[in-house]
Amino acid sequence: MKVSKEEVLHVAKLGQLDLDQEEVEMFQDKLSQILEWQEKLDELDLEGLEPTAHALERRNVTREDQVHNSLTNDKALENAPETEGNYFKVPRIIE
């Protein structure tokens, strides 16, 4: 299915996007490609398949927490250009 220039401009207007001619053509191609893929999916025989939101049945798969050795404060701060107490000191970026 070919998406028209007018359809791309309509969607751009809904999204308050200002597209130039090159972008309109690019989106025409991309949206047309997406719709062609959807048409291919529509051809699949899905009779007897249950609707699903996920390909796998797994839910909330977690692992046990494991304690690992970590750096001491002194070791972590060893190569820092500036420190203040037990913290890295970094330049202020917000006034």
From Swiss-Prot:
Record carries keyword Ion transport: no
Record field: catalytic activity: L-glutamyl-tRNA(Gln) + L-glutamine + ATP + H2O = L-glutaminyl-tRNA(Gln) + L-glutamate + ADP + phosphate + H(+); L-aspartyl-tRNA(Asn) + L-glutamine + ATP + H2O = L-asparaginyl-tRNA(Asn) + L-glutamate + ADP + phosphate + 2 H(+)
Region listing for Disordered, in residue ranges: 55-83
Example of a GO MF term: glutaminyl-tRNA synthase (glutamine-hydrolyzing) activity
SUPFAM superfamilies to which the protein is assigned, alphabetical: Glu-tRNAGln amidotransferase C subunit (SSF141000)
Compositionally biased spans, kind Basic and acidic residues: 55-67
Keyword Protein biosynthesis: yes
TM annotation in the entry: none
InterPro entries: Asp/Glu-ADT_sf_sub_c (IPR036113), GatC (IPR003837)
EC main group: ligase
Protein's GO biological process: glutaminyl-tRNAGln biosynthesis via transamidation; regulation of translational fidelity; translation
Keywords: ATP-binding, Ligase, Nucleotide-binding, Protein biosynthesis
E.C. number(s) listed in UniProt: 6.3.5.-
Protein family per UniProt: Belongs to the GatC family.
PANTHER family: GLUTAMYL-TRNA(GLN) AMIDOTRANSFERASE SUBUNIT C, MITOCHONDRIAL
Known function: Allows the formation of correctly charged Asn-tRNA(Asn) or Gln-tRNA(Gln) through the transamidation of misacylated Asp-tRNA(Asn) or Glu-tRNA(Gln) in organisms which lack either or both of asparaginyl-tRNA or glutaminyl-tRNA synthetases. The reaction takes place in the presence of glutamine and ATP through an activated phospho-Asp-tRNA(Asn) or phospho-Glu-tRNA(Gln).
Description of how the protein assembles with itself and partners: Heterotrimer of A, B and C subunits.
Name of the featured protein: Aspartyl/glutamyl-tRNA(Asn/Gln) amidotransferase subunit C
Species, as recorded: Natranaerobius thermophilus (strain ATCC BAA-1301 / DSM 18059 / JW/NM-WN-LF)
Gene: gatC
